[in-house]
Amino acid sequence: MTLLTTWPESGPETVVRRTSDPAEIAAALAPLGVRYEQWPVRADVPADADSDTVFAAYGPEIDRLNAEEGFTTVDVLGLHPSDDPEYPVKAKAARAKFLQEHTHDDDDEVRFFVSGSGIFYLHVNGEVHAVYCEKGDLLGVPRGTTHWFDMGTRPAFTAIRFFHEEDGWIGSFTGSTIASRFPDYDTIHAGHVGSAA
């Protein structure tokens, strides 16, 4: 279940908002220019599906979003626990790349979760909004929005990424250490999954 938690940027001691209601999440994010919607989940798509399988399953949704937003490049990014001895190294490097606060000057950051989960932290208007996204969630973060993404210490997700530019993901890092002051993916995931049980 998707979860939105909002705190003051000063720290996570006070929770301003916490909701799993999709309509409330969309309404809270819309004034920030953030697009949130849920797409139908394709039960026949394996968690670690390859790009061709994902594109075939979500073709109509991808085409609709490309037509609405003018995206020119779409790809699939996935990372899943494995017995490969390189997995821990790859997972750590992938997590570190996105975990520091950054912006995108030339493109929005739009992701659809085919499987698994991850958290986008949006640092906007004096608040930090942690959006715990999971299978079926589409999140569009407008260019220029300060944010970071945490996939956890054992990433397990597949996501469709949408770009206006062929260069793909290019982050402009702020140098802020704010991400270290807020609960990380592992902490939020453990509490969220535990509370849903």
From Swiss-Prot:
UniProt entry tagged with the keyword Cytoplasm: no
Cofactor(s), names only, from the UniProt record: Fe(2+); Ni(2+)
Statement: the UniProt record of this protein carries the keyword Repressor: no
Residue(s) at site: May play a role in transmitting local conformational changes: 107
Gene3D superfamilies noted in UniProt: Jelly Rolls
E.C. code: 1.13.11.54, 1.13.11.53
Pathway of action: Amino-acid biosynthesis; L-methionine biosynthesis via salvage pathway; L-methionine from S-methyl-5-thio-alpha-D-ribose 1-phosphate: step 5/6
Site (May play a role in metal incorporation in vivo): 101
Residue ranges of the TM segments: none
Catalytic reactions of this protein: 1,2-dihydroxy-5-(methylsulfanyl)pent-1-en-3-one + O2 = 3-(methylsulfanyl)propanoate + CO + formate + 2 H(+); 1,2-dihydroxy-5-(methylsulfanyl)pent-1-en-3-one + O2 = 4-methylsulfanyl-2-oxobutanoate + formate + 2 H(+)
The record's free-text note on cofactor binding: Binds 1 Fe(2+) cation per monomer.
Protein name: Acireductone dioxygenase
Protein source organism: Streptomyces avermitilis (strain ATCC 31267 / DSM 46492 / JCM 5070 / NBRC 14893 / NCIMB 12804 / NRRL 8165 / MA-4680)
Taxon lineage: Bacteria, Bacillati, Actinomycetota, Actinomycetes, Kitasatosporales
Gene that this polypeptide is encoded by: mtnD
